Amino acid sequence: MAGLAVFIHGMWGTPDVWRNWRAFAEGRGWQTMAPALRHHDAPPLEPPPELGTTSLGDYVADLDAQLRALPEKPVVVGHSMGGLIALLLCARGLASAGVLLTPAPPASVIALRPSNLLAFARIVPIRMIIISKITTPRD
């Protein structure tokens, strides 16, 4: 057996986003789990009001408790906000390894650089032209 991998979804995601990754890992001998973050098990168009008051610390505390209950330290795999959560769990020594897929940056890190703005500045006008052509009524 390869070990245990815990897949952590991002904001507005659900554990289902990991179904293909889990199948891939399980096909290679891994045990996997993908817990739902607090208040992320409702349909996306009907989020519970509590979602707006749940903090990153709440998510980390929930997963901290789940990982401490496991018989071994897992590999944590996280995407976006789940990547930041995975990083924080690794920092607490709760994982044997971490895989961070485009993680959200910690609060003290400024991830937006001028080059990012330039890239978006080129894309946005093109999209606006395309959108205006699509949405402009025809006579």
Give the ranges of each region predicted by the language model.
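Conserved alpha/beta-hydrolase
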Residues: 25-47
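Active-site glycine-rich loops that stabilize anionic/oxyanionic intermediates
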Residues: 10-14
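Short beta-strand immediately N-terminal to the catalytic nucleophile in serine-hydrolase-like folds
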Residues: 76-78, 101
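Active-site loop/oxyanion-hole signature of alpha/beta-hydrolase fold enzymes
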Residues: 39-74
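Active-site signature of alpha/beta-hydrolase-fold catalytic machinery across serine-
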Residues: 20, 88-92
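Gly/Ala-rich beta-loop-alpha elbow adjacent to hydrolase catalytic centers
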Residues: 78-82, 86
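Flexible "cap/lid" loop of the alpha/beta hydrolase fold
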Residues: 94-130
